[in-house]
Regions:
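Intrinsically disordered, low-complexity sequence elements enriched in Ser/Thr/Gly/Pro
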Residues: 4, 29, 52-53, 123
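Ordered, amphipathic secondary-structure segments that act as subunit-interaction surfaces
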Residues: 10-43, 47-52
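Acyl-group handling in specialized metabolite and lipid biosynthesis
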Residues: 53-60
Length: 172
């Protein structure tokens, strides 16, 4: 018998690194059995993109009011119908719980961390685009509640590119 982490590590050694592997109960489903997830969205605000991180961050060379973004993020914490924050129209349920949104900045690097029960199609990227619009002053802090009330995607911000988004942790 080959340890699962070793066998998979041999196949994917250039793309991923396996730190641990565990046996799971019958019926386990990696996505459907999850009780929560944490995503991190990485931004680079420098005038020119960092050559070492440009493939893994969204280059957004604008001044951001991180305090305004944090205030807006607090309005999104809780259990809501997030229909206005998804691009998929036929979701069975759009009710999700966001436990935390943390926005950290150091120099020209900014990271936005999202923790919740789960996220809809494009939800984290739309939330990020909305918070960036708050940060640039293009929208008010209070406006982040409009897509929750109206369930209208057009009331939310732009779809941030996938390039800066990482699934950091899955909770079971």
């Amino acid at each position: 018998d080959v340890a699962p982490s070793r066998g998979l590590g041999d196949v994917y050694k250039r793309q991923i690194r396996i730190l641990d592997a565990e046996l799971v109960r019958n019926g386990f489903h990696a996505r459907k059995s999850a009780v929560g997830k944490k995503y991190i969205y990485q931004l680079d605000l420098a005038e020119k993109p960092d050559v070492f991180t440009r493939r893994y961050t969204y280059h957004f060379p604008q001044r951001l009011d991180l305090d305004a973004m944090r205030k807006a993020a607090q309005l999104l914490i809780g259990t809501y119908e997030f229909a206005g924050y998804t691009d998929k129209k036929d979701e069975k349920s759009t009710k999700r719980t966001i436990y935390a949104i943390m926005i950290c900045g150091q120099g020209s690097k900014v990271s936005i961390q999202y923790e919740g029960t789960g996220f809809l199609y494009h939800m984290v990227r739309i939330l990020t685009g909305t918070l960036l619009e708050v940060g640039t002053g293009a929208r008010s802090i209070e406006s982040v509640k409009e897509p929750l009330k109206s369930k209208d995607r057009s009331q939310a911000g732009f779809l941030a590119p996938a390039r800066g988004l990482f699934l950091d942790e899955v909770y079971y």
